[in-house]
Amino acid sequence: MMPTPVILLKEGTDSSQGIPQLVSNISACQVIAEAVRTTLGPRGMDKLIVDGRGKATISNDGATILKLLDVVHPAAKTLVDIAKSQDAEVGDGTTSVTLLAAEFLKQVKPYVEEGLHPQIIIRAFRTATQLAVNKIKEIAVTVKKADKVEQRKLLEKCAMTALSSKLISQQKAFFAKMVVDAVMMLDDLLQLKMIGIKKVQGGALEDSQLVAGVAFKKTFSYAGFEMQPKKYHNPKIALLNVELELKAEKDNAEIRVHTVEDYQAIVDAEWNILYDKLEKIHHSGAKVVLSKLPIGDVATQYFADRDMFCAGRVPEEDLKRTMMACGGSIQTSVNALSADVLGRCQVFEETQIGGERYNFFTGCPKAKTCTFILRGGAEQFMEETERSLHDAIMIVRRAIKNDSVVAGGGAIEMELSKYLRDYSRTIPGKQQLLIGAYAKALEIIPRQLCDNAGFDATNILNKLRARHAQGGTWYGVDINNEDIADNFEAFVWEPAMVRINALTAASEAACLIVSVDETIKNPRSTVDAPTAAGRGRGRGRPH
């Protein structure tokens, strides 16, 4: 008698296992790498991605591109996640980490097809990664923090390396200096929140500026605003979460009115409530009043008569940055505006930038903060500039915390490749082949740099292998002269942390994908979502 089959999974569940599904997962990861392969390096191309809502994004940043791709393959999502983690951890090297992970998998694919056990591959990869990380730490060059001039030079070079593959690479010296200035203005915690980036359309990139303080766009203002002064020295700043508008209180109360005088008394009380608030603010000594909620026309004119400046509907993050920079605290009532809840700064002024007016707070005593004001033409271009600066800022922060650097341009990868290849020849068994495969995979970075620049990769890699075998540790691809060069001398520097993180993350992702032996996809729920309730009559949009 036939045994009854045990049905464990729901009908329609897609389950695949064994070597074919592992090979399929590896192939999916290679497809993801293909998407960002051409963006690597100073001659990398950009991608134009249009999302479901029709918003266009032009980007060269691996993490941004992978976030915008709607990846559904479960194994390929792992690569998207490591690119995101690299972006969050060190800010740069997102394309490199994706390429490395895909190349590690590509190199072990033949061994997987031949039936080599995944655990042997994972063991070899972990050994190779540990050796590579130790080697980076051993050969990385440490820059002395005590020498401020040297340290600044190092930081600028690291920022320029991060910016050289971006759209703004032509202005990398200009922006690298600004980025280093910005990070140097921060306190020891180097909080990213304390650097604001505002974009103003129009003008050239070189018109961008760095403000040593807080800056935000002038908010919507009512009549009477033009009478207010636009510049103060050492003002006190009131930060409020209070609505300063005339409110009809009859909406909030039920009142029986017998005479006209009673009604007049109610109207007078409404005015008095508002004037009472305004007087308290005036008596507190504040010269600049910022509120998250609207400040109406009556209040605007009241402040103008008393030489005070006000701005309502200030975005919350700008209000918080002003509070962190100028001191004080955001008040939800005006009843206790004492001196210790008011902020201070050296200069407040409103200035025209392009077609916009901006409010500037400079010389803030409390916390070090700064704001980039970016200029440029197309909106997409300015957004890409903002992403590029974010990468450079992250790199400079990392370089301050960990002061060891390595040479970029494929130099460190070639050196590690040579070191691991030599090591693999000293060990017996299957590990030798796998560590050799890991070493070969590292060459994808210089190879892709050559391919993206249109060079003969085979020729340049042969030269690099020969030079590294002779002891030229820092030799990498010279993009400008279609040759190889000592990239440490050429100041193509990046923090050792970037490379360590990239190698570790790529190796972990490769091990994770190799260790999966079965993929089970549950069927999509077939129950239709409940239809949206019909809109009220006369309110529905036309279908």
From Swiss-Prot:
Mg(2+) binds at D92. It comes from the Eukaryota. One of its GO terms (biological process) is binding of sperm to zona pellucida. There is a cross-link at K430 (Glycyl lysine isopeptide (Lys-Gly) (interchain with G-Cter in SUMO2)). Its EC number is 3.6.1.-. It is found in: Cytoplasm. It is an enzyme of class 3 (hydrolase). It catalyses: ATP + H2O = ADP + phosphate + H(+). The modification Omega-N-methylarginine is found at R535. Changing E379K: Found in a patient with developmental delay, intellectual disability, pyramidal and cerebellar signs, cerebellar vermis hypoplasia and hypoplasia of the corpus callosum; uncertain significance. One of its GO terms (molecular function) is ATP-dependent protein folding chaperone. The modification N-acetylmethionine is found at M1. The keyword Zinc-finger does not apply. InterPro entries: Chap_CCT_eta (IPR012720), Chaperone_TCP-1 (IPR017998), Chaperonin_TCP-1_CS (IPR002194), Cpn60/GroEL/TCP-1 (IPR002423), GroEL-like_apical_dom_sf (IPR027409), GROEL-like_equatorial_sf (IPR027413), TCP-1-like_intermed_sf (IPR027410), TCP-1_chaperonin (IPR053374). Keywords: Acetylation, ATP-binding, Chaperone, Cytoplasm, Hydrolase, Isopeptide bond, Methylation, Nucleotide-binding, Ubl conjugation. Component of the chaperonin-containing T-complex (TRiC), a molecular chaperone complex that assists the folding of actin, tubulin and other proteins upon ATP hydrolysis. The TRiC complex mediates the folding of WRAP53/TCAB1, thereby regulating telomere maintenance. PANTHER family: CHAPERONIN. This is T-complex protein 1 subunit eta. It comes from Homo sapiens (Human).
